[in-house]
């Protein structure tokens, strides 16, 4: 099957639904190597939900896992996803990667649900994060530009529940909105400008995903 939608999106051999709202990859086929590429993680399916568990022991450091949509190149447009992590301290880091080349070269927007409703206002400002690996890790961005590439989320989502994320990507900017809010919780200058794949992203602990939608720029 060949689908051509715009210069920002090229798909070949991908099981997905294409509509006016964009492309909806079939998450239930995450373990089908013709449709998805799972990197440094184990993926399981429960109905429409994908649970992604990164390899490695979280007690000994960060371990990033990805589930990447095969044969898809994305540069600009809108990404949407429903996510669920955990509210326990350092229980989950989860989000979406784009411009993916490999396990260490990508841009990502990810969330720290355990910071959503933290009693410490400074800690709440770490709820959502943009990175552009390998150069712009969260450590580098926090040290070099504190408070610029991460932010709090208002209104506060349930740290242990499902929440909806919309990520708008242009050549210059990345903006993030949560649960249908018209006010972005994070707007940053884009630090990576590569075309690449789109994927589910986890660090250290398992997370759940559903309803991925990719809407390329017209």
Region locations from a protein language model:
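Secretory/extracellular carbohydrate-interaction modules
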Residues: 64-137
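Short, solvent-exposed beta-strand-to-loop segments that form ligand-recognition rims
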Residues: 177-197, 201
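Ligand-recognition surfaces built from glycine- and aromatic
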Residues: 193-218
């Amino acid at each position: 099957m060949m689908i051509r939608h715009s210069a920002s999106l090229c798909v070949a051999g991908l099981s997905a639904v294409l509509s006016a709202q964009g492309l909806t990859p079939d998450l239930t086929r995450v373990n089908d190597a013709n449709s998805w590429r799972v990197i440094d993680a184990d993926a399981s399916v429960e109905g429409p939900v994908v649970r992604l568990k990164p390899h490695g022991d979280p007690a000994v450091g960060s371990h990033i896992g990805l589930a990447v949509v095969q044969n898809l190149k994305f540069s600009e447009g809108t990404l949407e996803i429903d996510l669920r992590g955990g509210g326990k301290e350092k229980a989950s880091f989860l989000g979406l990667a784009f411009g993916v080349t490999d396990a260490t070269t990508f841009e990502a927007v990810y969330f720290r649900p355990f910071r959503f409703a933290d009693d410490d206002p400074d800690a709440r400002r770490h709820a959502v994060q943009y990175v552009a690996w390998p150069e712009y890790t969260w450590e580098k961005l926090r040290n070099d530009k504190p408070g610029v590439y991460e932010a709090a989320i208002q209104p506060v989502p349930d740290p242990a529940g499902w929440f909806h994320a919309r990520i708008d990507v242009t050549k210059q900017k990345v903006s993030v909105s949560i649960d249908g809010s018209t006010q972005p919780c994070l707007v940053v200058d884009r630090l990576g400008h590569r075309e690449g794949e789109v994927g589910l992203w986890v660090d250290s602990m398992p997370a759940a995903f559903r309803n991925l939608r990719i809407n390329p720029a017209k």
